[in-house]
């Protein structure tokens, strides 16, 4: 059969990324407590296209993805090598967005339930391999100003901490989640019985955090971790008494 994609293109315009997106695919990721965890990822995969090639072969991306076993740093790099080889490309890109579940016990009744954390792996490889790992962690914040000026109570809300890192050495997803949770007014739990709800309410009140405080607490922990060489942190507070959200952002490198 005629291979239309491989026909010559006379316009001479190279394409930086061409590929597939929003592919829902079962994957297995590493889990600190249970060794592995099965989840569903939404995958984007792309490759650089030479200026004299008319099109890419979309099915070859899926063929390369289908060879994956456990999705980790080494496996992602091998996937990018396969994409480069199958597509005759100098550079390849892939991103996995997926829900990850961490079993947590509540602070008083010790009720066990999973907490969903949205995660992503984003990687590319030309001459060098570059991998970013991201987590989006739901947490609880309580406003220090509201507490200070009020006779009783303080406005509080859910916030989301996005931590994205490039690593020198391996870190568990759970470790990044713990950094976010320990920096907030209080962690979140999927189930709260009344004694747990009391603990969470009082814990947050005793530990108020502006969005700026939360961001800085995360950065203090990340910047002191030698396993991390680069980081990006974004905190968004879903404000409960305002008709807007609040956010804070920082990006940096660990040079040591």
Swiss-Prot record:
Gene3D superfamilies: Urate Oxidase. Pfam families: GCHY-1. Its EC number is 3.5.4.16. The keyword ATP-binding does not apply. Pathway: Cofactor biosynthesis; 7,8-dihydroneopterin triphosphate biosynthesis; 7,8-dihydroneopterin triphosphate from GTP: step 1/1. InterPro entries: GTP_cyclohydrolase_FolE2 (IPR022838), GTP_cyclohydrolase_FolE2/MptA (IPR003801). It comes from the Bacteria. Disulfide bonds: none annotated. It catalyses: GTP + H2O = 7,8-dihydroneopterin 3'-triphosphate + formate + H(+). GO terms for molecular function: GTP cyclohydrolase I activity. GO terms for biological process: tetrahydrofolate biosynthetic process. Converts GTP to 7,8-dihydroneopterin triphosphate. Belongs to the GTP cyclohydrolase IV family. This is GTP cyclohydrolase FolE2. It comes from Caldicellulosiruptor saccharolyticus (strain ATCC 43494 / DSM 8903 / Tp8T 6331).
């Amino acid at each position: 059969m005629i291979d239309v994609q491989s026909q010559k293109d006379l316009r001479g315009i190279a394409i930086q990324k061409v590929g597939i997106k929003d592919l829902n695919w079962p994957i297995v990721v590493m889990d600190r407590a249970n060794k592995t965890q099965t989840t569903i990822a939404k995958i984007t995969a792309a490759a650089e296209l030479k200026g004299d090639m008319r099109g890419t072969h979309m099915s070859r991306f899926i063929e390369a993805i289908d060879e994956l076993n456990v999705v980790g740093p080494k496996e992602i790099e091998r996937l990018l090598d396969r994409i480069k080889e199958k597509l005759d490309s100098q550079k390849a890109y892939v991103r996995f967005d997926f829900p990850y579940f961490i079993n947590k016990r509540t602070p008083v009744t010790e009720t066990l339930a999973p907490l969903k954390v949205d995660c992503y792996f984003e990687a590319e490889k030309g001459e060098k391999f570059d991998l970013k790992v991201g987590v989006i962690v739901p947490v609880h914040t309580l406003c220090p100003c509201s507490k200070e000026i009020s006779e009783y109570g303080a406005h509080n809300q859910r916030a989301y901490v996005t931590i994205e890192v490039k690593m020198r050495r391996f870190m568990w997803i759970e470790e990044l989640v713990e950094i976010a949770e320990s920096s907030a007014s209080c962690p979140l739990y999927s189930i709260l019985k009344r004694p747990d709800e009391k603990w969470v309410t009082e814990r947050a009140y005793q530990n108020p955090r502006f969005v700026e405080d939360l961001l800085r607490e995360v950065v203090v922990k990340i910047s002191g971790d030698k396993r991390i060489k680069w980081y990006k942190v974004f905190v968004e507070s879903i404000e409960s008494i305002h008709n807007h959200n609040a956010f804070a952002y920082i990006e940096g490198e660990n040079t040591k």
